């Protein structure tokens, strides 16, 4: 179970979807947008890896979920890229959940970043937008304990048949309030002010 990684650092990159295309999910235009952004994410990982190689460091690009043995969501959360949302995807304060990831494994001595909270957990607890929009009702209203960790959970036994039947979906990321252009950073600031008042 697992494999060994010799590189000590991981760089996470994210490229944002065009909202006008992704909001059409599950239509083919949204699927094409996802593929365009996977391509952009892969190109960014390869460009960064090539630069690191040029600088004398080992670097291995990981260009998407089907081209890598690394699960990027846990790495992205650990790197502070975002938090897990109710819909099972990362929510980044700037991009919402409307983006695609790539990564680069490297031995370059880069500074480490840490997980960051921008209020997603509290927000998702009170929000039902993705849950109500999900045609197969795969998004659970409450967290579930999975492998000893209580977290947001998507029932993939419900999600995947719908996803496969429509050759993709993405409704949950398209309707997420964080994904609307210009909303995420303002929402994160508002939630931060609210947390500071409570503390």
Describe these PLM feature segments.
Residues 1-171, 175-197:
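Catalytic cores of enzyme domains
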């Amino acid at each position: 179970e697992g494999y060994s990684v010799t590189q000590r650092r991981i760089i996470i990159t994210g490229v944002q979807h065009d909202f006008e295309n992704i909001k059409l999910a599950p239509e083919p235009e949204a699927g094409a947008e996802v593929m365009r952004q996977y391509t952009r994410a892969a190109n960014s990982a390869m460009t960064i890896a090539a630069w690191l190689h040029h600088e004398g460091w080992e670097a291995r690009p990981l260009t998407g979920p089907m081209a890598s043995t690394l699960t990027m969501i846990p790495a992205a959360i650990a790197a502070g890229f975002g938090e897990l949302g109710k819909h099972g995807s990362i929510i980044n304060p700037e991009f919402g959940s409307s983006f695609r990831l790539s990564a680069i494994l490297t031995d370059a001595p880069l500074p480490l970043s840490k997980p960051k909270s921008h209020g997603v957990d509290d927000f998702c607890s009170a929000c039902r937008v993705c849950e109500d929009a999900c045609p197969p009702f795969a998004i659970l209203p409450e967290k579930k304990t999975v492998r000893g960790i209580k977290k947001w959970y998507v029932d993939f036994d419900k999600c995947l048949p719908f996803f496969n039947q429509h050759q993709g979906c993405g409704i949950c990321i398209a309707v997420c309030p964080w994904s609307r252009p210009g909303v995420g950073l303002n929402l994160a600031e508002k939630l931060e002010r609210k947390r500071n008042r409570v503390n």
